[in-house]
Design a protein with these regions (language model features):
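Boundary/entry segment of secreted carbohydrate-active catalytic domains
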Residues: 1-15
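A short, structure-level motif marking secondary-structure boundaries and short turns
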Residues: 2-4, 39-43, 78-80, 123-125
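Hydrophobic faces of well-ordered beta-strands that scaffold small-molecule active sites
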Residues: 3-7, 30-32, 67-72, 106-108
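Residue-level marker of alpha-helix boundaries and capping positions
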Residues: 8-10, 46-47, 85, 130
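Active-site-proximal loop/turn and secondary-structure-junction residues that shape catalytic pockets
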Residues: 9-11, 34-36, 74-76, 110-114
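Catalytic domains of carbohydrate-active enzymes, especially glycoside hydrolases
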Residues: 15-37, 101-105
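Active-site acidic/histidine proton-transfer and metal-coordination neighborhood
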Residues: 16-17, 54-63, 76-140
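Glycine-rich, positively charged N-terminal anion/phosphate-binding segment
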Residues: 35, 41-60
Length: 140
């Protein structure tokens, strides 16, 4: 059996040290949410470049840790078209970055049909699900 961990649940250390620590703890894969794990360099959409992916991939490989999931947990059910466009752009950047990183999965959530990303009873309805599916299609 191989065990993985959400990297943002590990000891807060500089990126390279954190991944080495994950290996020392016995984990072989991790869930990477860049903004929650990395503080010493930017992880904005524009920063998610092939060069950054190559650097990070080498750090993971050196420590025998795979990236199992690249986390991008934003509200794809957001009803505000301007906010949704930014969210969609962020997902596209993460999907590209995941492919360069050698990660086959970008994590998401179904979201909430409001701008505040608040859990409300409407989150569990058919309309919310269809909104999510509609908004997910351009991303995948």
């Amino acid at each position: 059996m191989q065990l993985g961990i959400r990297l943002h649940d590990t000891k807060k250390l500089p990126f390279e040290e954190r991944i080495a620590n994950v290996h020392e703890l016995g984990f072989v894969c991790g869930h990477l949410a860049p903004g929650k794990v990395i503080s010493e360099f930017p992880t904005t959409d524009e920063a998610l470049t092939p060069g950054l992916a190559m650097y990070m991939k080498n750090v993971f490989a050196k420590n025998q840790v795979d990236v199992a999931v690249l986390g991008c947990y934003l509200n794809l059910a957001n009803p505000n078209p301007e906010q949704l466009a930014k969210i969609t752009h962020r997902y596209m950047a993460h999907i590209r970055f995941a492919s360069w990183l050698g990660c086959g999965v970008v994590g998401t959530e179904t979201g909430a049909p409001n701008e505040t990303y608040t859990a409300v009873p409407e989150c569990h309805g058919e309309e919310a699900l269809q909104t999510f599916i509609t908004n997910l299609r351009p991303v995948v």
